[in-house]
Amino acid sequence: MTGNEFRFFLSCDISVPVTFRVERLEGNLPLPNPKSPDLETNAPTENRTKELFVECALYIDGAPFGLPTRTRLESSGPSYCWNELITLTTKYRDLTAQSQLTFTVWDLSHGEGLIGGATILLFNNKKQLKTGKQKLRLWAGKEADGTFPTSTPGKVPRHERGELERLEKLVNKYERGQIQRVDWLDRLTFKTMERIKERESLKNGSSHLYLVVDFCSFEHRVVFQESGANFLFPSPIASTNDIVVVWDPEVGKINPSEHKQLKLARSLTRGVIDRDLKPSSNERKSIQRILKYPPTRTLSGDERQLLWKFRFSLMSEKRALTKFLRCVEWSDVQEAKQALELMGKWEMIDVCDALELLSPVFESEEVRAYAVSVLERADDEELQCYLLQLVQALRFERSDKSRLSHFLVQRALRNIELASFLRWYVAVELYDPAYAKRFYCTYEILEENMMKIAAGVNGEEDGFKQWQSLVRQTELTAQLCSITREVRNVRGNTQKKIEKLRQLLSGLLSELTYFDEPIRSPLAPGVLIAGIVPSESSIFKSALHPLRLSFRTANGGTCKIIFKKGDDLRQDQLVVQMVSLMDRLLKLENLDLHLTPYKVLATGQDEGMLEFIPSRSLAQILSENRSIISYLQKFHPDDHGPFGITATCLETFIKSCAGYSVITYILGIGDRHLDNLLLRNDGGLFHVDFGFILGRDPKPFPPPMKLCKEMVEAMGGAESQYYTRFKSYCCEAYNILRKSSNLILNLFYLMAGSNIPDIASDPEKGILKLQEKFRLDLDDEASIHFFQDLINESVSALFPQMVETIHRWAQYWR
């Protein structure tokens, strides 16, 4: 089962009796009332042994259902421990959503004295059956009330819940096997929990009694559903105007005739297999329509049958392989065997389709191994474009030492840049407890194999030195984290923090200004960095105080890097990777839109590096120069050029605006404002800070794309020829990227198991939103009209201009 699946049982399908265990009573019993008539005639209180029992009853919709059940008498207290299994005559399938159990504790030591009672609903507010240990607070002197709503709820009020309740929930998960067992750590944890429990008891006093009950657990969650609830349909022959609801017990079940026909049609042992069978004209149209489906679409039964029927004639169509493999019944041994034989003879698929075969949909090891064999044809540059997703695909493998893991390591050993990125991508995933063991296995294999590399005849370093250079990257990031913490602790404005940074680099941490040996830059492993230049390093004016560090390189140059601590850069890393990939796809079609795919690398869950690109935000530019054109005139003046700037500069601005308008629309980039739109001196515009993607946006009523009026004015206004050229570039880029929609969708699908916030929250919904942006239902001409309407809608949006003003006010006070 993958991490994205939620498997469950329906309560209406469970035909076993309701079972639970009454465990113990916690807390101190109240002292008897001295004025009680029982105490006046009986022995003194201190000599009387209390004899307690618990009476349990089931109430359905506020009415008693069945007879009450009692536990045995227990007198060996405190604490009173029954640990008795109670089985009711009622079955889980008979329960309603408002079913509840009542528990009343009685004392027989003097008559039939009432200690207290409590009630608990069997289903929570998500309609899931409660399982595991439940701690019920008893209402002293009250018999449990089974009416709905009850007057004796056993649930502790939210404002009174302490740390102990959170721990008890974790213990329930631990006992259900949802938390990994680590013996030595578990022993320490339970000892600490006992101390917390004692502390909570002392803090709360002994004013409350609690009854601990252990509910039955199942392999999967149990979700409430009434018997036949989904199979009620209005009668088509109702003789009155009222809607008559009848239950058809066969609705929703497999039709035996259709199932038999399907088995016969696909049987490999009956009849003659016609390998030369060709589809008719209509069938060919249907097949072509199916082959155009995006990888996210599920095939219907008829579509699967159609592809299976003409599987032999489709072997020369490479696009058909992934669709064919989706229609295979892998549980049928003979069918799976023939599918694998055909796969080996099929026309070799493209790398894009191989990525689809590594998705969680395909579990067959042979299919996944075939996908890896296709990837082996890709060169290092192309492989690096998909490396982030290929590392995530390790989650879907059936073993830690898979063919994919071996392939990634072998390619990394041939290219130090691939090795550096692979090491970082794997290292970041070690924070995921569910897959830490798998990623650590790949990390170890990479380390062991790299250590075995001998020094090259042309002066190449041996494997040990190469690995040590990569390890020193981690040591560097650890020191940068320490610097960030020191700087944040400085009180005062940004200038004081900058002074502290330079003071640290020149004093305590002066070893960072000149490294003993050059280190490969984590962002660009081909570049060797030799130390930090304190005088050229600074801090950004931001809540997290990112460091802007200037590194001297081994060849005498410099490179600037931004280091951020306290921000998860994995989402930014993914978006910038997509920008880089789309830039590559556009250039393959001879369309260079002057994009700026700067480098981003997450080095941990809340830290990472970004390449610094000399630029200024549009907010700064407009504040100081009033317009974008006035700013560009300072760097590229031309009295004879359009608007007083060179034609090359204006063309760069128009193209980059078009490129990012299309990309931010497709990826659903949110939270766009003038502070995260940057402009280079050559006129190239680019976006930064991708905290919201796939349609999420903290601002109300966001436009489809970020295209502010100042950008349109820089092109001469909505009626100018340059604005028309901008729209033309947008439409051309949109249609080019639509052709590669399957590649982009496959890459996002492989990220479905990652911990990237906007994907992890709902992977299926996010990928469907991405698919929707491509408008695959339109042809190229219709998509041009669609995108032009989209541009017009974005330019005329008023609300974002109001939000921009509010954002500027917020920045002023920061």
UniProtKB/Swiss-Prot annotation:
A Gene Ontology BP annotation from the UniProt entry: endocytosis
G-loop, as annotated region: 539-545
Domain PIK helical: start-end pairs: 274-449
Listed SUPFAM superfamilies: ARM repeat, C2 domain (Calcium/lipid-binding domain, CaLB), MHC antigen-recognition domain, Protein kinase-like (PK-like)
EC number: 2.7.1.137
GO annotations of cellular component type: cytoplasm; endosome; membrane; peroxisome; phagophore assembly site; phosphatidylinositol 3-kinase complex, class III, type I; phosphatidylinositol 3-kinase complex, class III, type II
Region listing for Catalytic loop, in residue ranges: 668-676
Residues of the PI3K/PI4K catalytic domain: 533-799
The family this protein is said to belong to: Belongs to the PI3/PI4-kinase family.
Protein name (database record): Phosphatidylinositol 3-kinase, root isoform
Organism: Glycine max (Soybean)
